[in-house]
Amino acid sequence: MSLQEKFDAAVEIIQKLPKTGPVATSNDQKLTFYSLFKQASIGDVNTDRPGIFSIIERKKWDSWKELEGVSQDEAKERYIKALNDMFDKIAEELDVAAWLEQIDPVIKTNLALIGK
């Protein structure tokens, strides 16, 4: 399986995660996944920094800007690793296999594709 296919599977997992419940991403995790996604998909920041009153957009832009110079492939690898690390931590407190039986089957399939 190619890096792009693994990355696409990882992105779909993040998009399909429930918004609430035992496996919900924190704001910091969301920011990490956002910036890695942008770097992996587009490359270096290609827009102006949002104004001071656009707090959320500015945080997102700053997080992406921090990845300047990271290759798109490296950003894809980091995205997948961040997702794997997140599930490793979740597995310390939750029966992930049982949880996976209760949610969108695509998540379980895609976790297998990225090596979980």
From Swiss-Prot:
GO biological process: fatty acid metabolic process; lipid storage
Binding residue positions for an acyl-CoA: Y34, S35, L36, F37, K38, K60, Y79
InterPro entries xrefs: Acyl-CoA-binding_prot_CS, Acyl-CoA-binding_protein, Acyl-CoA-binding_sf, FERM/acyl-CoA-bd_prot_sf
Matching SUPFAM superfamilies: Acyl-CoA binding protein (SSF47027)
Annotated Gene Ontology cellular component terms: cytoplasm
Lineage, highest ranks first: Eukaryota, Metazoa, Ecdysozoa, Nematoda, Chromadorea
Keywords: Lipid-binding, Transport
GO molecular function per UniProt: fatty-acyl-CoA binding
Family classification: Belongs to the ACBP family.
Pfam families, per the entry: ACBP
Keyword field contains Transport: yes
Name this protein carries in UniProt: Acyl-CoA-binding protein homolog 3
Biological role stated in the UniProt entry: Binds medium- and long-chain acyl-CoA esters with very high affinity and may function as an intracellular carrier of acyl-CoA esters.
Residue span(s) of domain ACB: 3-92
